Curated annotation (Swiss-Prot):
Molecular function GO labels: 6-phosphogluconolactonase activity
Alphabetical UniProt keywords: Carbohydrate metabolism, Glucose metabolism, Hydrolase
Coiled-coil annotated residue ranges, if any: none
GO cellular component terms given for this protein: cytosol
Pathway: Carbohydrate degradation; pentose phosphate pathway; D-ribulose 5-phosphate from D-glucose 6-phosphate (oxidative stage): step 2/3
Name of the featured protein: 6-phosphogluconolactonase
Catalytic activity: 6-phospho-D-glucono-1,5-lactone + H2O = 6-phospho-D-gluconate + H(+)
UniProt cross-references to HAMAP family, sorted A to Z: 6P_gluconolactonase
Length: 338
């Protein structure tokens, strides 16, 4: 069993869904009312807490997760910026709150009880900062800045959680590309960046120390593959746990594109695309790599797909209403869920 948490800010709810892996069935377990518009969510590495960014009264709410995945609010922490994206370090000791509108990353300590403490650092002047991503060595945070057409790199102090510019500090993408979200290969030194404005995935190769970085491929998610569009509004990107398939979503075309990650070069080979929910703001691949769930911000529905292991293709399993404007999806995978 797995639990999906889906935030729907337009009706100020979090929907808690249970997935039965064997029966391929989604069941609504709980609907939680939020004090404001719930947007970014992230599960603590110990899987005992869910953190939810709230607007317009800027704060992060902390929920305790029960043994069966249900939520109980235990804390509300005021912050000084509008939360866009939340990331937690692997040790569960610091949360990094990205604000697109305030152009910053807010570093907040997490205590041993899972509660948020005061902000310890704010990195400012990051124009259109849209996500915070930590690669497999856990030492560097990557922050795509959409309005700068850059990806900023920061060294993480694992004791204090603070950030300082890495060397090199910046990866430049094409003008008017708009780097937004990222996914990392889990065993090799490759990163995949979805650009919001031009619908291009940048494939970045780097060495162990992340001192030599190169964009080795730029591949369009749609326009060169049978769908003639000049406008993009690309949103999200994820890789299956076995590093074989990569998916990305576009909100203008309402599509999910599928790529194969080539074994030898780690470059991308386009396979196909499908039409999905209206305005797919967020999607997620489950921990088994067998399922993909997408949230339609304008359709107000979610769709559960099966991922076919042999070719990566998606087939619809079920579709469900999930509030108004569903945006963010987080997953809980615990052996104790029943």
């Amino acid at each position: 069993m797995q639990i999906f948490y889906i935030s729907s800010p337009d009706n100020q709810k979090i929907y808690v869904w249970k997935l039965d892996n064997h029966q391929e069935k989604l069941e609504l377990m709980q609907v939680v009312s939020t004090d404001g518009c719930a947007q970014p969510t992230v599960v603590h590495p110990n899987q005992n807490f869910l953190y939810v960014g709230i607007r317009p009264d800027f704060k992060i709410d902390t929920y305790r997760i029960s043994q069966n995945g249900l939520l109980t609010k235990i804390q509300s922490t005021k912050i000084c910026d509008s939360p866009t994206y939340l990331t937690i370090n692997i040790y569960g000791t610091f949360i990094y709150c990205v604000s697109y509108n305030f152009n910053c990353i807010n570093v907040i300590k997490i205590d041993k009880f899972g509660l948020l403490c005061n902000s310890i650092q704010i990195i400012k002047n990051m124009l259109g900062c849209h996500s915070a991503n930590i690669n497999k060595d856990r030492k560097v945070l990557w922050a795509p800045c959409l309005q700068e057409n850059t990806i900023r790199l920061f060294d993480i102090d694992h004791l204090y959680g603070t950030l300082k510019p890495h060397n090199p500090h910046v990866i430049n993408t094409n003008m008017q590309s708009g780097p937004r979200h990222m996914a990392f290969h889990s065993t090799d030194n490759y990163a995949y960046v979805i650009n919001e404005y031009n619908g291009v995935i940048d494939v970045i190769q780097y060495n162990d120390s992340i001192t030599n970085l190169a964009i080795i491929q730029k591949i369009n998610i749609l326009s060169n593959h049978g769908l003639d569009t000049k406008k993009f509004w690309s949103s999200d990107i994820h890789i299956t746990p076995n590093n074989r398939w990569l998916y990305c979503a576009d909100r203008f075309c309402n599509t999910i594109s599928l790529f194969e990650i080539l074994l030898n070069t780690k470059k991308l080979k386009f396979i196909n695309y499908i039409y999905t929910e209206d305005q797919p703001r967020g999607f997620l691949i489950d921990s088994t790599g067998n399922f993909l769930i997408v949230a339609g911000q304008k359709s107000h529905f979610i769709t559960l797909y099966r991922i076919h292991a042999n070719n990566g293709n998606l087939s619809v399993i079920s579709r469900h209403a999930s509030g108004m404007g569903p945006m963010w999806i987080s997953i809980l995978s615990k052996n104790t869920i029943h």
